[in-house]
Amino acid sequence: MGRAFEYRRAAKEKRWDKMSKLFPKLGKLITIAAKEGGADPEMNAKLRTAITNAKAQNMPKDNIDAAIKRALGKDGVVITEVNYEAKGPHGVLLFIECATDNPTRTVANVKSYINKIGGQLLQNGSLEFMFSHKAVFEFPKSHLHMDREELELVLIDAGLEELDEQEETLYVYGDYTQFGSLSSTLEELKIDVTKASLQRIANTPVEFSEEQLADIEKLIDRIEDDDDVQAVFTNIA
């Protein structure tokens, strides 16, 4: 989605009490990361990042440990990552990332949300060329203990594409394949990253009116309320 809408959503979500929904979602990401790369955070950058994000949201240690144990197969639950692509109200494009133990249930739910507003679930791959897959790191400007230009020079070698600033928060952008490299470099610089994620950013963001945005946000809120949905990306400017 466009940067402006992305920041607006982030600011809005900070005001919402979403802990009951957030912890299960964060737990699934930890489980997937541990299953892919092992249960030791020191040896698994993706898991280390997932744990950092969970701690930033005050997720209890017991919940984090339980999520890692699930990856070891101790409760028999298998979590699968699945993506869905759709067209919503006013022609907005939606890229929906999910983590689920029941893909059949998840696709039925997502389809129902889209259909209720006259939207359409698209064939997977339809929107791939409309979005760029990026690694994104966020941290307060106050966490930076070096000159910004110096930081850019160091991060360029690690895959930095853009360093952006919004309301005293710095955003580091790079290709998704450079996630590990950028993460390691930020750690080496002892920069306390408050959030790290893989995002899909619209290549050609579209402007919508406030009335249209209200309709679109209602749908996004409904989709994000689903326990299986991890993230919703759009082509909103």
Curated annotation (Swiss-Prot):
Keywords attached to this entry: Cytoplasm, DNA-binding, Transcription, Transcription regulation
Compartment(s) where it occurs, according to its Swiss-Prot or TrEMBL record: Cytoplasm
A biological-process GO annotation: regulation of DNA-templated transcription
UniProt cross-references to Pfam families, sorted A to Z: TACO1_YebC_N (PF20772), Transcrip_reg (PF01709)
Cellular component aspect of the GO annotation: cytosol
GO molecular function, one term: DNA binding
Domain of life: Bacteria
Keyword DNA-binding: yes
InterPro entries: Integrase-like_N, TACO1_YebC-like_2nd/3rd_dom, TACO1_YebC_N, Transcrip_reg_TACO1-like, Transcrip_reg_TACO1-like_dom3, YebC-like
Family: Belongs to the TACO1 family.
Stated name of the protein: Probable transcriptional regulatory protein WS1016
